[in-house]
Regions:
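Alpha-helical transmembrane segments of multi-pass membrane proteins
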Residues: 1-320
Length: 320
């Protein structure tokens, strides 16, 4: 809800700001080129500065301080989205005016741009959700979107009346080469450090046992530093938030979640465990001799696959 709110605020602000552009003598194509470049470069810059843009992970369900919760969500969403959405809000009216060519055709121009925008929003959501994110991951998907903005900037420049036609062609080729080289030289792990942290701060990468960027979340498992008292302690971190753990305290209640209900049933043959987590509840249910089948459901396939790291604590639940 907050991200949608910030998105709409950005679009609205951009629509107000573009009025000043219309009242000036600025070249609309030039302004649109700059806006497309700004969107692309901001997205690329955010990949390098995600830890600075977003606050450290925290408990977002603290309802005792609703104003603080609201302001923190708003600040994070604004840092990530506000400037690009302002640029998008300015681009839409500029495109309408460029396509219309005059007040007498404003209806046609608005319909064409609005139709293309709606179609693009639907197609973009489908392609991103079902193709880009599963196949490319978050970083490469964002980089691809930023590249599309930069390519649109190139197209607008190439089809404009800047300089001579030959010079425009040469500059377009150079820009395309620069974009290609930059894309090829991008590190593939820019967002890894962002997800390798929780509310206690940055985690030690030397203690990383498992890492996977999945469709719905990014999962990391770290070895906890509890010393000789608990040498096998581990922590499950999803999207930068510590969600579960294997240690003396956590393991006791997680296994009790299975043992107590099963002991209260006369003939417990089938068990359903909602949320897999570290798999300790699922594994504990499976050790009961009367239980014939245990089903565990979880929204995250990455969390389930990480369960192998906890096999010594969850009774090897995934291979039982």
């Amino acid at each position: 809800s907050m991200m949608l709110g910030v998105f709409l605020i950005g679009i609205s602000l951009g629509s107000f700001l573009v009025v000043a552009v219309f009242r000036s003598s600025l070249n609309l194509r030039t302004v649109l080129i700059l806006l497309q470049a700004a969107i692309g470069l901001y997205v690329i810059g955010s990949l390098y500065n995600m830890e600075q843009l977003l606050s450290t992970p925290w408990n977002g369900y603290n309802l005792q301080k609703p104003v603080f919760v609201f302001s923190r969500y708003f600040a994070d969403s604004s840092a990530l989205m506000l400037l690009p959405t302002i640029a998008l809000g300015m681009s839409f009216p500029i495109l309408i005016k460029m396509i219309s060519g005059g007040h007498e055709h404003v209806g046609i121009g608005t319909g064409q741009i609005y139709g293309a925008n709606t179609f693009g929003a639907i197609l973009g959501s489908l392609i991103t959700g079902f193709l880009f994110l599963p196949r490319l991951g978050v970083q490469q998907s964002l980089l691809l979107v930023a590249t599309l903005n930069l390519l649109m900037m190139m197209y607008l420049f190439r089809t404009g009346d800047y300089f001579t036609k030959t010079l425009r062609k040469m500059m377009t080729v150079v820009l395309a080469g620069v974009i290609l080289v930059v894309n090829m030289g991008f590190p593939s792990d820019l967002l890894d450090r962002f997800f390798m942290r929780d509310s206690t701060g940055q985690k030690d990468i030397r203690k990383l046992l498992y890492f996977e960027e999945g469709l719905t979340d990014t999962v990391a498992v770290f070895k906890d530093n509890y010393g000789a008292l608990d040498p096998d302690a581990k922590r499950l971190v999803t999207n930068g938030v510590s969600m579960s753990a294997v240690n003396f305290i956590a393991s006791r209640y997680m296994k009790l979640l299975a043992h107590l209900p099963i002991m209260l049933v006369d003939n417990p043959e089938e068990v359903l465990v909602v949320c897999f987590g570290t798999g300790q509840t699922t594994g504990a249910a499976a050790v009961h001799p009367k239980v014939k089948a245990v089903d565990s459901v979880d929204l995250s396939g990455s969390v389930v696959r990480a369960g192998n790291v906890f096999s010594s604590q969850n009774y090897n639940a995934l291979k039982n």
